[in-house]
Amino acid sequence: MTTSGTRAAHRPSRRQWVIEAATELFATQPPDEVTVADIAARAEMTSAAVYYHFSSKDQVLVEGMRVFAAALREQVESLTEAHRPGSDIGPVVTGLVVWLSEHRSAATVFFVSSAGMSQEAEALRHEIRTQLLDELVRLVGKGREPVSEAEAAVIGLGVLALLETAAVSQVRGDDVYRSLGHRSFLHEVGRLAERIADPAAE
C-alpha cells in the first residue's frame, strides 16, 4: 500500500488487478461509458498507476479479452484431448458452457460488451474464433469416425455457432435461458450439439 491507500503501480500483479477491475466494469456498463478513473477506482489504484501498464482503456479491454480467450482456448483443447473417440460431443459442449458460466464477467465482455468496440477487438475476436473452430473440428473428428475434412469443418462451424449463441443467451439471461433454467438449458445445448454432429442419430 502507498501512503494514500492506493496500490503501487509497478508490481506485476497490479496489471492483472487492472484487467480484472476493468472486466467487471465492462461486463456491467457500456465500455464507452467506462473511464480510466473508474477502472482505477475499482482496482484501488490511481489513474496514473493504470496508465503505467496501459496506454488507454481500449488497451485494457483488448488485453482482458486476450487473457480470457487464451483460457477459453486452453479449456477447449483440454476437453478435446480428453474426449473419448467415437463418443458424443454433447458433454464437451455443455462443459464449455458451464466453464463460461464460471467466468461470467469475462465471457460477457468477450461475447457481448466488446462487440464493435474497436478494430483491434474485432481482429482478436476473429483470430480466436478461427482457433476455436480448428479445435472444434478436431473434436468432431474424434467424435465421429470416419468423417471427411469438409464434413468436419461444416459440423465444426455449426457447433461453434451453437456455443457462441449459448454463451450470449447465458450471460444475458435472455428469455430462453430464464424459461428453461440453467440445468435444462445445458441439457438442450448438449442435445443440439449431438444433433449437429450426427443428425442421423436422431
Model regions and ranges:
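Hydrophobic alpha-helical connector segments
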Residues: 63, 77-105, 146-147, 155-159, ...
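N-terminal intrinsically disordered/low-complexity leader segments
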Residues: 1-13, 20, 24, 140, ...
